[in-house]
Swiss-Prot record:
This is tRNA-cytidine(32) 2-sulfurtransferase. GO terms for cellular component: cytoplasm. One of its GO terms (biological process) is tRNA thio-modification. It catalyses: cytidine(32) in tRNA + S-sulfanyl-L-cysteinyl-[cysteine desulfurase] + AH2 + ATP = 2-thiocytidine(32) in tRNA + L-cysteinyl-[cysteine desulfurase] + A + AMP + diphosphate + H(+). It comes from Agrobacterium fabrum (strain C58 / ATCC 33970). Binds 1 [4Fe-4S] cluster per subunit. The cluster is chelated by three Cys residues, the fourth Fe has a free coordination site that may bind a sulfur atom transferred from the persulfide of IscS. Keywords: 4Fe-4S, ATP-binding, Cytoplasm, Iron, Iron-sulfur, Magnesium, Metal-binding, Nucleotide-binding, RNA-binding, Transferase, tRNA processing, tRNA-binding. Its main location: cytoplasm. The thiolation reaction likely consists of two steps: a first activation step by ATP to form an adenylated intermediate of the target base of tRNA, and a second nucleophilic substitution step of the sulfur (S) atom supplied by the hydrosulfide attached to the Fe-S cluster. One of its GO terms (molecular function) is 4 iron, 4 sulfur cluster binding. The gene is ttcA.
Length: 311
């Protein structure tokens, strides 16, 4: 049976007895991870959950995320997306569809008013192996970034370096991050408009040292779906005071632009994401990707040229 069909089957089974009630404990047959005991019992939530699981599993298959990795560190910021990622991974693992060990990790970066108790209590409650580590990168960011500058880039780099270190210390071979479809598209357009290059946010990346995979299983998941999922699951969301306190960020401008396009032409975000998976180097302008100098008039028909080309 195809793995995506298995996902449909087990979500249907988990949701079959839920219709007609708003919330409540799941059946004793263990069809769902205990994290979902108090999840909504509606048809709409069941469809949302299934869609997200299929998107995650499709990313696993498309990008070879299950090739050789045995132990994953799941970055948990306290935001809706990282909570959702952890829940979906636990859902798959509970049903035997994810043959890896999971370790959740939160890096407390010393942000003002950060509620230190929320994540440890939540992770202990749901019985997930985890590590909470304090590193005051906030002070470094405040010191290094000039007044009026944006914190996100430096904050992200400092956080990533610490997560790499923690992953190694925990014996993990991959770091999983909760970036979704909109994050990837926003990054693409930031690079397009401000960086002068075509580059997005890879779903799977080998770090510079070559010892850790960085993976984004939510690459196909819509931010709107993740927000609905987080609200339905009632995750204890922790806001990011650093990002939320700054206006005029380039990413916010890209987010607004994409939202406007989607509002005027529904479905364009999915089309944009598909475009990132269908690249034609000969129709761009980068001679490093396509040898334009080798093009020559041969008189051969298209069929003959195809036959002469190496497979």
């Amino acid at each position: 049976m195809n793995i995506l069909t298995k996902i449909d089957d087990f979500v249907d089974q988990a949701g079959a007895d839920k219709v007609g009630a708003d919330h409540g404990p799941s059946e004793e047959n263990g069809s769902s991870h205990p994290l979902f005991d108090n999840a909504p019992r509606s048809v709409s939530f069941n469809k949302l959950r299934k869609r997200l699981l299929r998107n995650v599993r499709q990313a696993f298959e498309d990008f070879g995320m299950l090739n050789g990795q045995k132990r994953w560190l799941v970055g948990l910021s306290g935001g809706k997306d990282s909570y959702g990622l952890l829940a979906l991974l636990l859902d798959l693992k509970w049903r035997g569809l994810l043959p890896v060990e999971l370790v959740a990790c939160n890096l407390d970066q010393g942000q003002p008013n950060f509620p230190k108790h929320v994540l440890p209590e939540y992770l202990a409650k749901i019985g997930v192996a985890h590590r909470i580590e304090y590193r005051d990168t906030y002070s470094i960011v405040k010191e290094k970034v000039p007044s009026g500058g944006t914190y996100c880039s430096l904050c992200s780099r400092l956080r990533r370096g610490n997560l790499y270190r923690i992953a190694r210390e925990e014996g993990c071979d991959a770091l999983l991050l909760g970036h979704h479809r909109e994050d990837i598209l926003e990054t693409f357009f930031m690079n397009f408009f401000h960086g002068g290059r075509l580059a997005g946010m890879p779903a799977k990346l080998l770090n510079d040292e070559g010892d850790l995979m960085v993976m984004r299983p939510l690459a196909y998941c819509a931010e709107e779906d993740m927000a609905k999922f987080a609200a339905a699951m009632e995750f204890p969301i922790i806001p990011c005071d650093l990002c939320g306190s700054q206006d005029g960020l380039q990413r916010n401008a890209m987010k607004d632009m994409l939202a406007d396009i989607e509002r005027r032409m529904p479905g364009r975000k999915d089309v944009m994401l598909r475009a990132l998976a269908h690249v034609n180097p000969s129709h761009l302008l980068d001679p490093k990707l396509f040898d334009f100098s080798a093009l020559a008039v041969t008189g051969a028909s298209p069929e003959e040229r195809r036959e002469a080309s190496p497979p």
